[in-house]
């Protein structure tokens, strides 16, 4: 039976967890690690920790023991609330609460704020280090990002209002709760008072069944998730019959390419609503059903500019996206756990994008410039150009002493071979933009966050070139 979580029911579980943690000695301001798979217990634990006014350190449950040890050491973690990974946490057993064994509220001490009848977020909202999250590290080493409660909650409120969520909605996040995107949706659910479906996001077929049974109205996922959906729709079109109540299909976590967007609209009759946000800034811009272009316009109170050659870019000109927002980070943690404040008014995203004549933000990906044959190229901008040929493309640039860079194009296509794609790319790219090698793959590798595993592709590219291959 598919279960939809409603705030009033989860609140009781959260108060029980809060009371149990308080009895163990958890105090306001202490750093508490929160890790675990998506579950009602994880949702309750997040609310309990907010209620206790602690500094929440979010960690993915798939992390190796040495990575968890690094996080707990850097963040000066005192306690942990965890699920199946509890045994691998480098803390005394008495400091770890098993997320899979929640307790009921203890009415013995009604004066204890943890035993109060409602979850209160006011104190946590005033905390400067309310959340410590690690950026995904898709293209480099992860950074420990410190966010205030005010930044996190206000961004959630603005997002909820912008998207038009109501108490009648049922949200279905097909992504991990232990990251910025997932946590944001949990807080939006709580603030809105709507329903929440906890679906098995790594197993799409049962997830689609749960969406249909629950009457979910808003679905969120990453591009690979929607690629998987389209495969299931093609195999069994009956899946679509149960999804008629979904009014918004939202996508984030990685750039949305045009072929995927067009295929999804063709299959469902509805657009994929792209969004743009970062761990450091929260949500920045979100597309809407009546403006399903690019990443939409910036949220109220969020300013976005595009800079090219140290000056503001012209309308439609591509450059680095910079953001000024109340939702930005307080700073990063130093190796000793102290805060290195981020004081710049504008946050440099290191993402490449443009703003069109309607004020819509278009983001192409990371701003990793390479120099090749006397030209400055941006691999992720080349990806968007190449995808006009009809399939998802990832471009890996490797250093080359003579040319400056060697370009390997990976194409997600299980039907056509490299020779076909060389011809297509030759027609849509300038000579200095064309690949040295083309590799077709039935599916791109993905990491634990559901994003394309760029490091795995780099290893494939390096191995190809070491072996003298050219992808033909």
Predicted ranges, named:
Residues 297-301, 311-344, 375-377:
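Conserved ATP/PPi-binding loop(s) of AMP-dependent carboxylate-activating enzymes
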Residues 396, 408-410, 421-472:
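Conserved C-terminal "lid"/linker of ANL adenylate-forming enzymes
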Residues 19-63, 174-176, 376:
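Conserved AMP-binding/adenylate-forming
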Residues 108-134, 140-141, 164-170:
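Conserved pre-ATP/AMP-binding loop-to-beta segment of ANL
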Residues 325, 352-433:
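AMP-binding/adenylate-forming catalytic core of the ANL superfamily
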Residues 216-221, 232-292, 303:
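Gly/Ser/Thr-rich phosphate-binding loop
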Residues 153-170, 178-218, 232:
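Conserved AMP-binding/adenylation subdomain of ANL enzymes
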Residues 4-8, 130-157:
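Conserved AMP-binding A3 loop
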């Amino acid at each position: 039976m598919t279960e939809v979580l409603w705030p009033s029911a989860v609140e009781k579980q959260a108060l029980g967890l809060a009371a149990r943690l308080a009895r163990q000695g958890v105090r306001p301001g202490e750093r508490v690690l929160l890790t675990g798979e998506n579950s009602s217990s994880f949702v309750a634990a997040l609310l309990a920790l907010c209620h206790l006014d602690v500094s929440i350190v979010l960690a993915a449950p798939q992390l190796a023991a040495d990575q968890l040890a690094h996080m707990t050491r850097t963040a000066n973690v005192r306690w942990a609330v965890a699920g199946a990974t509890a045994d691998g946490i480098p803390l005394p057993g008495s400091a770890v609460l098993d997320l899979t064994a929640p307790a009921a509220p203890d009415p013995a001490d009604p004066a204890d704020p943890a035993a109060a009848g409602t979850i209160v977020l006011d104190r946590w909202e005033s905390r400067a280090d309310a959340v410590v999250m690690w950026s995904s590290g898709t293209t480099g080493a992860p950074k420990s990002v410190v966010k205030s409660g005010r930044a996190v909650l206000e961004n959630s409120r603005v997002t909820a209002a912008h998207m038009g969520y109501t108490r009648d909605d049922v949200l279905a996040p097909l992504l991990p709760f232990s990251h910025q995107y997932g946590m944001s949706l949990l807080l939006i659910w709580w603030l809105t008072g709507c329903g929440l479906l906890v679906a098995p996001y790594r197993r799409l077929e049962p997830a689609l069944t749960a969406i249909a049974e629950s009457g979910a109205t808003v679905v969120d996922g990453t591009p690979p998730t929607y690629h998987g959906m389209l495969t299931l729709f093609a195999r069994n079109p009956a899946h679509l019959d149960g999804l008629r109540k979904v009014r918004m299909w939202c996508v984030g976590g990685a750039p949305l390419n045009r072929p995927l967007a067009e295929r999804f609209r063709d299959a469902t009759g509805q657009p994929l609503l792209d969004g743009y946000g970062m761990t450091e800034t929260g949500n920045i811009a979100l597309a809407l059903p009546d403006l399903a272009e690019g990443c939409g316009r910036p949220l109220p109170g969020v300013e976005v500019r595009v800079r090219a050659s140290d000056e503001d870019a012209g309308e439609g000109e591509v450059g680095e996206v910079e953001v000024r927002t109340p939702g930005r980070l307080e700073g990063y943690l130093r190796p000793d756990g102290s805060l290195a404040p981020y004081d710049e008014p504008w946050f440099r995203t290191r993402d490449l994008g443009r703003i069109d004549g309607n004020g819509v933000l278009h983001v192409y990906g990371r701003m990793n410039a390479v120099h090749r044959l006397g030209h400055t190229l941006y691999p992720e901008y080349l990806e968007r150009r190449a995808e006009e040929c009809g399939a998802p493309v990832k471009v890996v640039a490797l250093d080359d002493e003579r040319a400056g860079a060697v370009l390997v194009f990976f194409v997600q296509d299980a039907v056509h071979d490299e020779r076909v794609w060389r011809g297509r790319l030759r027609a849509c790219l300038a000579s200095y933009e064309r690949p040295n090698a083309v590799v077709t793959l039935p599916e791109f590798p993905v990491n634990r966050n559901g994003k394309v595993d760029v490091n795995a592709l780099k290893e494939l590219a390096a191995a190809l070139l070491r072996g003298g291959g050219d992808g033909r």
